[in-house]
Each structure stands twice: as structure tokens, then as C-alpha cells.
């Protein structure tokens, strides 16, 4: 698998990205880190200045990531790899596959180089996967459309590795999972995902209720549930089939409603939601509002079982900054690093909750 080639952008590309895709506050920060101060200049003027500068590869990558964040909503998903063999090294398996030009993989996967980084004093490896997107009834000019995502893998304990996927499509996490499924020896390894089908109906509600309590560390204070998706429970559907004649003589205000998507405030205590719970339902997605304890930042995090199969993923869908004496919420953004840190913390806490619930079955 060939090494990714760095191509320096054209001047107009830098100017266009700075002017239209990067938030002003991040543009100021990036300039100041390079010793350039232009606080009173317009965004257009700053973009022209930046286009005339020469930057290293790391800074260019920061431009790219910030621009992508402004135009896409990144989601984080992941899985665990365990093995009955001794000395499992997912890193070594991946690198051997990457260096093997004769290895045949589906989807025309391109495996990027692994980069060693550190999180909370612990080493991990960052990689990149490019893959071909296949669509039914493909249109010719879309033939070469590709997906791309970054992933992070680290050893949690002997013979156990965790892989986290930072992508812009729900399919990204599943593609990374498919890749490692092809690379691993299926007779001695298992891949564990957060799949809603492994939870009973009431356990899906327990899962999201625990997320409300334990989703993020104390730096972020939970405020409200601002969106909620739920549907009729699997247990209820099976019971209705078995007792179809009896059900025909009984009707409730919820008869015929199979799924509901609510947006607003105080949704966890909503009367309609409680009635649905009484009749048996599954929670599949929730958007939670958090307020930062030390800064005027407010975020909306969407926690969702999505796709087929429905795998758990996390995304930040809204970012606000409270401004003025009235603390009016204005649209804002987080740095790429902080955005990823928040999603990672949330997903890992959700993974702990999920495993606790599944272990009780």
C-alpha cells in the first residue's frame, strides 16, 4: 500500500479555505501561533495574508481539518478486538497488511501510515483509511467517489485492542470494522461493537438514562434532552402478533404510531414519551445539551444507534457561545482537537455503560 504523498496547496486554495471554511476565532488563533497579528483586519484581508505565507505540512493539515469540520459533522464510533492467542498486536497486523502489495482487500482500500501519538500519557496509533463508495445504479461521473476517515487504535490490556473511528459518514466506522475483520484470524479473534440488537427494549432506555448521568466528565454540566428518537419495542410487536385478536378490541392513543422523533426541551420528562414507555418502546437516539463549567460554551451531542446494523456513534451537532449580559446563544465552534476529545470521552463512557448493561443479561 503506497505512502500518502503531500501536495502543497495553491495560493488561491489557502485563501478560499481561510475566507470561507475556517471560523474567524480559529483563524486568529492559527495566525497568532505563527506570530501574525491582524485582529482589526477583515477576514478577506487575513485570508490574503495567509495565502502569501509558507506553512509546514502540520499547519496545512490543521487548515484541512478545520475546514472539514466546518463543512462536515464528524461522528465517532468504535469497536474492541480480543484474541485467544498470546501477544496480539493489531498495530503489527495492520502494518504488515499495508506493506503487502499482493494483499487483496475488498472496496479497494488504501491504508495510510500509522503515526504514534499520546493521549493522557498513553501511546496510541493514528491511521487513515480511504475506500471506494459503491452505490446501486451507479452514475458514471460518480464512479470514483471515495470515503475517507481517520482511526485511532491502542492496546487496552493483553490481547485486547480498542479502535476508534473519526469519520463524516456512518459507513466510515463500519468500513474500518470490515477492514480489520479481513485482516484478523477469525478462529482466534473477535470484534465487539456497540450494537442496539444486543440490548433488550428496556435496556435501551436504561442505556440512554445512564448516558445522561455519566456521558461527560464534570467539566461539562448536563442541561437538557433537546431531541429524542424512539419506536415501538420489539417485545411489544411480538406480543401483538401472538395476541392479535385480543389487541383488536383494545385501542390506545398510541395505536398505529411506530416511531417518533421529538425536538424541543425537557423531553425526557415529556408525557408522550412516558406513555410510549408504558406501552413498550426502544430509545435509539438522543441529543443532549451540555454547558461548560468554566467557559461560555454550550454543545449539543447526538448519541445514536445508526445504520444497518445499528451501531452506536457520537457527534457534536451544535456549538454555541453565550454572549452578553443576557447570555444569548450564538453559533460557535470548537477546535478540531477539543471536538475530538469531547466525542472520545463521551463514546468511551457510553462503551462502559453499554458493557455494564450487557453483562447483566
List each model region and its residues.
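Intrinsically disordered, low-complexity, charge-rich terminal extensions
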Residues: 1-361
Amino acid at each position: 500500500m503506497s505512502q500518502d504523498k503531500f501536495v502543497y496547496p495553491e495560493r488561491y486554495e489557502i485563501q478560499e479555505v481561510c475566507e470561507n471554511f475556517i471560523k474567524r476565532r480559529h483563524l486568529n488563533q492559527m495566525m497568532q501561533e505563527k506570530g501574525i497579528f491582524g485582529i482589526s483586519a477583515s477576514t478577506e484581508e487575513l485570508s490574503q495574508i495567509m495565502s502569501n505565507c509558507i506553512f509546514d505540512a502540520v499547519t496545512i493539515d490543521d487548515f484541512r481539518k478545520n475546514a472539514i469540520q466546518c463543512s462536515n459533522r464528524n461522528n465517532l464510533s468504535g469497536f474492541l478486538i480480543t484474541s485467544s492467542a498470546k501477544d496480539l498486536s493489531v498495530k503489527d497486523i495492520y502494518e504488515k497488511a499495508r506493506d503487502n502489495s499482493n494483499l487483496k482487500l475488498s472496496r479497494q482500500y488504501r491504508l495510510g501510515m500509522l503515526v504514534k501519538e499520546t493521549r493522557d500519557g498513553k501511546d496510541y496509533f493514528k491511521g487513515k483509511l480511504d475506500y471506494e463508495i459503491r452505490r446501486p445504479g451507479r452514475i458514471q461521473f460518480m464512479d470514483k467517489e471515495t470515503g475517507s476517515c481517520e482511526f485511532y487504535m491502542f492496546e487496552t490490556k493483553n490481547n485486547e485492542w480498542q479502535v476508534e473511528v473519526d469519520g463524516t459518514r456512518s459507513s466510515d466506522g463500519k468500513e474500518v470494522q470490515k477492514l480489520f475483520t479481513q485482516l484478523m484470524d477469525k478462529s482466534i479473534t473477535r470484534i465487539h461493537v456497540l450494537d442496539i440488537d444486543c440490548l433488550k427494549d428496556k435496556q435501551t432506555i436504561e442505556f440512554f438514562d445512564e448516558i445522561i448521568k455519566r456521558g461527560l466528565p464534570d467539566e461539562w454540566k448536563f442541561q437538557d434532552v433537546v431531541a429524542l428518537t424512539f419506536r415501538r419495542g420489539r417485545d411489544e410487536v411480538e406480543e401483538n402478533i401472538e395476541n392479535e385478536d385480543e389487541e383488536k378490541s383494545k385501542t390506545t392513543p398510541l395505536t398505529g404510531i411506530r416511531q417518533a422523533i421529538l425536538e424541543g426541551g425537557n423531553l425526557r420528562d415529556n408525557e408522550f414519551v412516558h406513555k410510549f414507555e408504558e406501552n413498550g418502546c426502544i430509545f435509539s437516539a438522543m441529543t443532549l445539551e451540555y454547558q461548560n463549567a468554566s467557559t461560555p460554551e454550550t454543545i449539543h451531542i447526538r448519541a445514536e444507534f445508526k445504520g444497518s446494523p445499528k451501531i452506536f456513534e457520537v457527534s457534536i451537532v451544535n456549538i454555541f457561545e453565550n454572549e452578553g449580559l443576557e447570555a444569548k446563544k450564538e453559533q460557535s465552534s470548537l477546535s478540531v482537537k477539543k471536538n475530538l476529545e469531547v466525542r472520545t470521552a463521551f463514546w468511551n463512557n457510553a462503551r462502559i455503560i453499554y458493557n455494564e448493561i450487557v453483562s447483566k443479561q
